[in-house]
């Protein structure tokens, strides 16, 4: 169930956030997710670094956000476990820092503790979370919900949560990039953005197509799994995640 509901959860995460303006696709997040004061701070050069944090699967999902965002903006972007930020990267004054905290439940102890520590030092926080009114949402300046923020049946295996966190992360990365760089210009930039967002919008149907081949997938797994002792999964760019 956690796997088969992934396309719907992914689609809910995107709903209403990708809009067509004059034939070009744009990301549109409301102020509850990306407040105007944070947008202005990015525009005015007030942020010098962005940390993307989480624990376990959420930290892995965060690496996709950091990878895309680091390609789009010139300020430093780093993805790391929450415990690493709280243990080794804190500064007395972090008012020039945005922390993006990712948590399915919004109650991840290490992540919430780290958020408390960075906020006490002046950092701003945007959270990507599934659970509405969870502890993390109350500690954040902005909240971007995965699914519709009401998907309480999330497995520890974290399949649909993981996919939805990646979707939300891409939307947020594009929004931050636009806040810093201003409106897109140049045909090549529009083409690149349209390709990314169109691909994102088409993914739920492609996921359903893959899941419809479950019987064939089982056959392939039964044939190959016993045949090899070591396996490697490789990729480049966003495909690393």
Features from the language model and the residues they span:
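Active-site phosphate/pyrophosphate-binding segments
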Residues: 1, 6-51, 142-241
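Glycine-rich phosphate-binding loops that contact phosphosugars or nucleotide phosphates
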Residues: 36, 45-199
